[in-house]
From Swiss-Prot:
It comes from Bradyrhizobium sp. (strain BTAi1 / ATCC BAA-1182). It comes from the Bacteria. It is an enzyme of class 5 (isomerase). GO terms for molecular function: ATP binding; ATP-dependent protein folding chaperone; isomerase activity; unfolded protein binding. This is Chaperonin GroEL 4. ATP binds at T30, L31, G32, P33, K51, D87, G88, T89, T90, T91, G415, D496. It is found in: Cytoplasm. PANTHER family: 60 KDA HEAT SHOCK PROTEIN, MITOCHONDRIAL (PTHR45633). GO terms for cellular component: cytoplasm.
Length: 546
């Protein structure tokens, strides 16, 4: 085990605070509509330009081990806010820096760190209660567009695209963001359920121009196993032919004699049929097939359930108004499933999302939920250069999360105003002793930091702006740094999602309290001879130091 370097008390906190300041100062220049860009060096390719706080925070690694510990803990604030609400990362970082700075001063002055922490916790509870009380539910499409615009640093086009996407796929629908191949940003909406498996054979194609299978009012056979022979299926196929309706087979695979027979029947026109492989793998495949069955009002044919193919009749097949299959995707529109069954399945998936601890599983469950509940919207972000597209895509991602958060918990006046107003509620907060009172005061001062920083980034005097906002009693009164005017923030469309503001202050206070109550820090000592011995001469490469 290598030797360690240990720092205590004031020295430890000072080194840690330096790291906090370096990271927070790099992140906070991006705050607000007049926030600046940060350029990130990449080991290959062009540098990346961004105004996304968490992206900047994730790039920062410091040489000094103790400073780096402070920086990494504040980075955690940004990451946690990004995970919980998808936005508010810069606000959370600014708040954490303000609380740590004031807290470190108080500890150096001899106050009890644990009482300070209790005071901070009391203050945060009161602030969150005030935010929730003043939160306003999102009712119109315009408000969703406004939230998106603010989060995308004032880009109204992004706000409009997001509002359209949410209108089309609903609040549960999935919105994915991709890079476009052109200059224009565009929105593409897929209604119904889509999964990433195409036709097994191009001979199933019905629309040769688009190389696509299009079937109206189709039956859907959902089978968990491979189909190699059609003997078991013959009674069912004959029944389908008599109805005159097309059939889509979803199975693990269709091969050999079974595939050849289906293709021949399709080409002769006796049976309108197409086959696709089942989506997913293992248990996820079973779950997705069950989703398709519920959506289309059919049954997933599985030996686990004791159902054999020869016993399948028409009533066990799913139905859909339209099925479209291209080389890579299958889309089922207007499945014939019962509404109550679909709602029960949606509730079940939501419960699984709440319980899962894996981000990957959560993402996959949310995709399944969207396919059942709404649909899928794809925003393709365009731009003149790769650097511009990447920067814009970052902003669209932020805005997308912010609009979801707004729909979930409502909205508050933006521009740091909601936190400023909440700070007024802390003046009369009762505490058990002076140190706890100081903890409350630390949070009260910190709550003005985001509004102050937004003004500073716009080239204004932060303290003057904060003072003028607090002079007015009106809750939504604030400073529009884009125009330099004092306005009603809500009616001007400068709004923040409640969830974003709430998670920002909670995460900032949580990590800042830990930093304030730190009394010792332990880091590895750098190795004295890190280079290692030189290689012996040989092959013309002697003396090279690895």
């Amino acid at each position: 085990m290598s030797a360690k370097d240990v720092k205590f008390g004031v020295e430890a906190r000072d080194r840690m605070l330096r790291g906090v300041d370096i990271l927070a100062n790099a992140v906070k220049v991006t705050l607000g509509p007049k926030g600046r860009n940060v350029v990130l060096d990449k080991s290959f390719g062009a540098p990346r330009i961004t105004k996304d706080g968490v992206t900047v925070a994730k790039e920062i690694e410091l040489d000094d081990k103790f400073e780096n510990m402070g920086a990494q803990m504040v980075r955690e604030v940004a990451s946690k806010s990004a995970d919980a609400a998808g936005d508010g990362t810069t606000t959370a970082t600014v708040l954490a820096q303000a609380i740590v700075r004031e807290g470190a001063k108080a500890v150096a002055a001899g106050m009890n760190p644990m009482d300070l922490k209790r005071g901070i916790d009391l203050a945060v509870e009161a602030v969150v209660a005030d935010l929730v009380k003043n939160s306003k539910k999102v009712t119109s499409n315009d408000e969703i567009a406004q939230v998106g615009t603010i989060s995308a640093n004032g880009d109204s086009e992004i706000g409009k695209f997001l509002a359209d996407a949410m209108k089309k796929v609903g609040n549960e629908g999935v919105i994915t963001v991709e890079e476009a191949k052109s200059l224009e940003t565009e929105l593409d909406v897929v209604e119904g359920m889509q999964f990433d498996r195409g036709y097994i054979s191009p001979y199933f194609v019905t629309n040769a121009d688009k190389m696509r299978v299009e079937m109206d009012d189709a039956y859907i056979l959902i089978n968990e196993k491979k189909l190699s022979s059609l003997n078991e299926l013959l009674p069912l196929l004959e029944a389908v032919v008599q109805t005159g309706k097309p059939l889509v087979i979803v199975a693990e695979d269709v091969e050999g004699e079974a595939l050849a027979t289906l293709v021949v029947n399709r080409l002769r026109g006796g049976l309108k049929v197409a086959a696709v492989k089942a989506p997913g793998f293992g248990d996820r495949r079973k779950a997705m097939l069950q989703d398709i069955a519920i959506l289309t009002g059919g049954q997933a044919i599985s030996e686990d359930l004791g159902i054999k193919l020869e016993n399948v009749n028409l009533s066990m097949l799913g139905r859909a108004k339209k099925v479209m299959i291209d080389k890579e995707n299958t889309t089922i529109v207007n499945g014939a499933g019962k509404k109550a069954d679909i709602e029960a399945r949606v509730a079940q998936i939501k419960a699984q999302i709440e319980e899962t601890t894996s981000d990957y599983d959560r993402e996959k469950l949310q995709e399944r939920l969207a396919k059942l509940a709404g649909g899928v919207a794809v925003i393709r972000v365009g731009g003149a250069t790769e650097v511009e597209v990447k920067e814009r895509k970052d902003r669209v991602d932020d805005a997308m999360h912010a609009t979801r958060a707004a729909v979930e918990e409502g909205i508050l006046p933006g521009g740091g105003v909601a936190l400023l107003r909440a700070s007024e509620q802390l003046k009369g907060l009762r505490t058990k002793n002076e140190d706890q009172k100081t903890g409350v005061e630390i949070v009260r001062k910190a709550l003005s930091a985001p509004a102050r920083q937004i003004a500073i980034n716009a080239g204004e005097d932060g303290s003057v702006i904060v003072g003028k906002i607090l002079e007015k009693e009106q809750y939504a009164y604030g400073f529009d740094s884009q125009t330099g005017d004092y306005v009603n923030m809500v009616s001007k469309g400068i709004i923040d999602p409640t969830k974003v503001v709430r998670t920002a202050i909670q995460n900032a206070a949580s990590v800042a309290s830990l930093l304030i109550t730190t009394e010792a820090m332990v880091a590895e000592l750098p190795k004295k001879n890190a280079g290692g011995p030189a290689m012996p001469p040989g092959g013309g490469m002697g003396g090279m130091d690895f």
